[in-house]
Each structure stands twice: as structure tokens, then as C-alpha cells.
Amino acid sequence: LSYSCLPGGCPITAFMTDLPAAFFPPTTPPHYSRADFGPDFRWGVSTAAYQTEGSWEAEGKGRSIWDEFVRGRRAIKGRETGDVASDFYRRWPTDLDLMQQLGIPNFRFSTAWARVLPTGTGPVNAKGLDFYDRLVDECLARDIAPWLTVYHWDLPLALQQQGGWTNRAVVGWLADYAQVLARRLGDRVQHWMVLNEPMVFTGAGHLLGLHAPGRRSLGAFLAATHHATLAQAEGGRALRAALPASAQIGTTFSCSYLTPWRAGLPRDERATRRADAILNRLFVEPALGLGYPTAEAPLLNRLERYVQPGDEARLPFAFDFWGVQNYTREVVRHAPYVPLLWANLVGAARRGVPYTQMGWEVFPESLYHMLRQFSAYANAPRLLVTENGAAFPDVVTPAGQVHDVARQAYLQACIGQVLRARREGLAVEGYFAWSFTDNFEWAEGYAPRFGLVHIDYATQQRTVKDSGWWYQQLLAGEVITTIPSLGSTTQKATRC
């Protein structure tokens, strides 16, 4: 083994051989180190404002759609809110110190729109913008590069009251907000992302009603989809106009590798292609000038009612990079009772395969397949994995340790799949783990834990999990053994 004990007090390999084989796909390189990825590969962690900051009404901040959504009805498990979350707004120095201790060189975070512009437009809240100014400075003082996401789902409530993402004016609102941030922070922030996962905030927020603003309307989904697609391009142009020429501008896409429930059955194969068009291609292809994928998903022809003259030319934008955000694969079957899409997903529990606290299948190879799929576009920019991780139940031992071997195994398998992609020549240039700390996981509340750092929400005490110490060792250059990879003779380690 490369090393026997972590600072947390437990062997890296403890009880890993008790995990299902799904954690260790045979395509994973049996050994790797940071050096295998090259000196320019970007390593980091990701968070989001609403999920971590708390201080929801502090120092002039306006209300967001999530501040409203968590109060309106029983939308969140346990009726929990993000009012405090992991208290990052007040405890950011501690968290940045932990990042520095773990050797994490890049930190992706989002800004809270209503903290900067309380009503979404108009006067800037000086204290809110000052917070992000200090955050950027203190990241740089610790040799941590800030990566800023302009919009991570927390639309100001005042804009929602004007229609939010269903109002075409949101395209200009977002662009103006992006320029406010760029003018203040652009001299120090080199990497920018316009939107976080538009498929999620349009679909879960406007079609399924699971996320803010809680709409359940096909029309609202289609309007929000077109406006978000315009906004990702216009937001990119707004940043390009306001930032130094050296700045790198990207955006992020959620994605899942899709396979048919019954391989070779034509109706399941067709259902899988329809689902892929919606879940993986809907926001990607317009950015490349390819338009919406209506051939595979005729439902998207209904977007025409929201398209105005000149929109087709406005949808593309030459991003410097795409953020790929992948957690699982999905299995698709034909569903005659699901109108328009005629498809549904077959859950991991029903299929009898290992799954996470979120109910997502443990399938690290999904990341590799999506990197290949996105790289296959003729004009695709370089790719970075800007989110990847897993939620598993954590237990703090009496000694104050968190032995999260499942998360550690999942991360090392996924990172191995990134290396597999790079060895095949794909332009994958970074990996950001989701997430740095445990946080408020949207409709699921605080139960699912994704963090490398455990949060005791009663005391806000931080405890680095074994996965966090493992990530430190990877970043320090240690050789990682993917245990128990196919053919490995490594035996189960004993506790320290």
C-alpha cells in the first residue's frame, strides 16, 4: 500500500473490500497518481451559495426563490431550510483554511444573486458584493484559485414575481448581473461559469415542481428552457465584454449516461434516444449552433412558440470550457403512459444494483461515457468535471473521525475514469469534487451528505472525513491503488 494511515486515523483501504464490485469497474486504472494527469490538470472542490452560505437575510440580502420555496409548503424533507446551511457566510475563513490544509488548489463557488442585487436588478448591495470581494482575496492569499458560477438556482424572488425564467426579460437580467460581478471581481477571478445545470432548474423547477419555484407546467418548462438557453449565451457574451481577454468563460451541464432497459428492443432504444435528447443534449447543442435536438425529441418542437426572430443566431456561444457534472447512469424504458416523452427511468433499487443515499446507481463508468459523448462534438471546447461525488450515510466515531470508505472508493473510481478518458486523448482538463462540505441538498434537506468535510449542523463543527484526507494524499502526489480492482492481490487493511 502507498501509505498506511491518514491524519484522520484510519487506513485508506479499511473495509474497502466489503464494498460491492460496482465501486471497482475493471476499466479503472489499477494505480494512478496526480502526476499521471499532468502538471496543468486542475484539481478542486465545488460548492453553491444557497446550499452553504446561510445568513439568508443578513446585511441587506434580498429573498431568493429558494428562501420562499422552503417556506411555502412541505417541499423539503423534514421541512428543513437553507437559512443556516453550513454557515459559510460567517465561517468561510475556517473553510478556506481547511482547503489550504488539504492542499486544494481550486475552489468553485457561486454568488447569491439576491445578496448582490436584492431585487435582482437596480442598486447593488455593497455589503453583499464586499463579501465576495473578500472571499476572492482570501482564496488568493491561500494560493486557492477562485472559480465563480454566476447562477446556481437562487433567482431573486422579486424577479420570480415578474415571471422569473418564464419571462424573456430574464436573459437581460442575468447578463446585467454577470457584468456587475465581472466589473468588481474580474481582475482577480480568471475562471467563470454562466449557469449551473440548466436542465435541472428548468426541469425540476418548472415541470416537476420538485425545486423552486415549484411549477408543474409543460409551458413553463419550455419557456424557461428557451430563455435559459439564450441566457447562457448572452451571459457568456456579457462576461466576455466585461472581463480581461485572458479570462476563461464556461458553463456547466448535468448529464447521465443512458442505457436501454432491454438492450436490442427497438422501443426501449428509441426511448433512450429521446431521453438523451432532453437530459444530455438540450442545452449543449444550441450552444454549438446545432439548434434543439427536435428530431429525436419531437416534444421540443413546442419550443417554437417562444422563439423570436434572431434567436437562432443568439443561441451559440464559443465557451472556453464546459463543466461536466455527472453522478450516475440512468436506465430508460419505453413508457406509453408518459405522454410526449414516452419514456421513463428504471430506478436502481428496482434493478437490484448498489445505489447511494440519493437513490442513484453506483456506476463510475458513467463519467467516462459522458466525457466521450461531449468530446464527440466537432467544435466542443475542452472539458472539466466540475461536479462529481456521492452521498452516503456518515457516522462520526467517538474519536471524532468519519470513515467514509464508500465515498472514498467512489471518488477514486471516478477519478480513474477521468484518467481513462485522458489516456484515450480526450481533452479533459480538470476534476472538482462535489462537495467540499456537507450542505443543504435542495428538496432532500440535510440528510444526504456529499462532503469531504462533515458538518455537525447543531454545532457547525467541521470534521475532515477519510475521503478528504484521501484527496489530500492524492493531491500531494501519493500513488493511489484502486482497491480491490480486478486482479488485485491487496488484502483488507486493518484499522490503525
Feature-to-residue mapping (PLM):
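Catalytic domains of carbohydrate-active enzymes, especially glycoside hydrolases
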Residues: R91-A112
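Serine residues within intrinsically disordered or low-complexity segments
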Residues: S2-S4, S488
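Glycine-rich, proline-tolerant flexible connector loops at the mouths of alpha/beta enzymes
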Residues: T111-V124
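Active-site region of glycoside hydrolase catalytic domains
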Residues: T17-I76, Q100, T119-T121, L129-G400, ...
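Active-site mouth loops of central-metabolism enzymes
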Residues: K77-R90
